[in-house]
Amino acid sequence: MKKPIVQLLLIFTIVSIVLFLLNTSYISLYTFVGALWSITIVGISFVIFIENRSPQSTLAWFLVLALLPIIGVLLYAIFGRSRWRRKKHLHRSEEQRKLFREILEGRRLELLLTVPLNERSIHLTEVIQKFGGGPAADRTTTKLLTNGDQTFSEILRAIEQAKHHIHIQYYIYKSDEIGTKVRDALIQKAKDGVIVRFLYDGLGSNTLRRRFLQPMKEAGIEIVEFDPIFSAWLLETVNYRNHRKIVIVDGEIGFTGGLNVGDEYLGRSKKFPVWRDSHLKIEGKALYKLQAIFLEDWLYASSGLNTYSWDQFMNRQYFPGKEISNAEGAVQIVASGPSSDDKSIRNTLLAVMGSAKKSIWIATPYFIPDQETLTLLRLSAIAGIDVRILYPGKSDSIISDQASQSYFTPLLKAGASIYSYKDGFMHAKIVLVDDTIATIGTANMDVRSFELNYEIISVLYESKTVHDIKRDFEEDFKHSTEIKWNSFQKRSIKKRILESFMRLISPLL
């Protein structure tokens, strides 16, 4: 089943024809429709079986198809993984990895580490590069941006300073007050002669309308939608979304992290008057990788719409090689997605957390780890490492919230500490290890970020920003409630059943 939604539409078309032709025979119609549904369910089950998914995901799909067949088929049409699209993404990966290697080959001497790092950090940079991450870059400065006010102020300031190009990419971009403010800043720079490229995800930014985008097009801004959910086939599966958030100005200043563009990310919503998030500003050599990732996504999403090629971007205007001579530490940027089987971000997080000797602190809005991640955290806690997980006390997803809590029992019993952020919504995606190494980016601690979404994280080694991250953690803990095992185990049977059910269906979504 290359396109599940197409098969469903064909099925319902056939059923409609049969309803018209066989309206005199209720029994025949009932038998025919029943047989048709049975064949569909068996076919979907076979596809799921041969895809070699995780046992949890396979079991979840089988149970839903068996117990709720109609709902199960509809869910598969929307959330099922499309093999033809998977192959398309894998083909993209191979081509673009080769091109990125060419970029790095031309900058090999520039990318050699010159700042001394400790032995563990050096080892991690080498391991992560084998996982598919870019080379670690020194002569790069980073600045932690806490929450939306700091982040959007810095981004707007950088946009205002742009001289050659602005590349902007978001999963969610809303046409509200801050979205309009950023848009108008881009329009002004485009009118000034700056090249502006705007890339947004077809699902996350599905509320963007023509009347909002038209002034951008009229100003000369190039706009591309990443994998539209509506196409000539009416509806695509919603998997394989681009969850990355990237802004690059002149190849010299970059931004990435947890924040999308919208008023709610500034704490302007009634539901979440406080939106706790973290973003990162990057200047220096690490921009090589960030720029390459944006261009990979741009060339993929715009294929067929224009005649761009990598050759047009392989120059100093897009890869200027700006260096910050007095910078400390190093930065390593890692990207992953369905275009690779490497699970680069998941493996990077495992390597970073697995190197811990004293502490592992995690902030994530959704905690639905795979078995390897859960086992590592549990064993680390048993070994006496200070394992802490900070998650939102009030979530924007009941499924993720309840599913997350189903993983708390083995961690609490192992000695880990879990904190529920009580001031608002905790949306930061950060890992801090031993106060010396940290990761910050777009990836949640869940299977969707590890396997299905296009994500990006930055690994920070021995820099001031790592200490700033620790400072934010310590402040966040003050605004959180620690979940104690004695009280947590007293949850009602109804609550435990709900958690288990949400955990069961979470691999589907």
UniProtKB/Swiss-Prot annotation:
Its main location: membrane. It is a multi-pass membrane protein. GO terms for biological process: cardiolipin biosynthetic process. It catalyses: 2 a 1,2-diacyl-sn-glycero-3-phospho-(1'-sn-glycerol) = a cardiolipin + glycerol. CDD domains: PLDc_CLS_1, PLDc_CLS_2. Its EC number is 2.7.8.-. The keyword Lipid biosynthesis applies. Residues 238-265, 422-449 form the PLD phosphodiesterase domain. Keywords: Cell membrane, Lipid biosynthesis, Lipid metabolism, Membrane, Phospholipid biosynthesis, Phospholipid metabolism, Repeat, Transferase, Transmembrane, Transmembrane helix. GO terms for cellular component: plasma membrane. The active site is at H243, K245, D250, H427, K429, D434. The chain crosses the membrane at residues 4-24, 30-50, 59-79. Catalyzes the reversible phosphatidyl group transfer from one phosphatidylglycerol molecule to another to form cardiolipin (CL) (diphosphatidylglycerol) and glycerol. This is Cardiolipin synthase 1. It comes from Bacillus cereus (strain ATCC 14579 / DSM 31 / CCUG 7414 / JCM 2152 / NBRC 15305 / NCIMB 9373 / NCTC 2599 / NRRL B-3711).
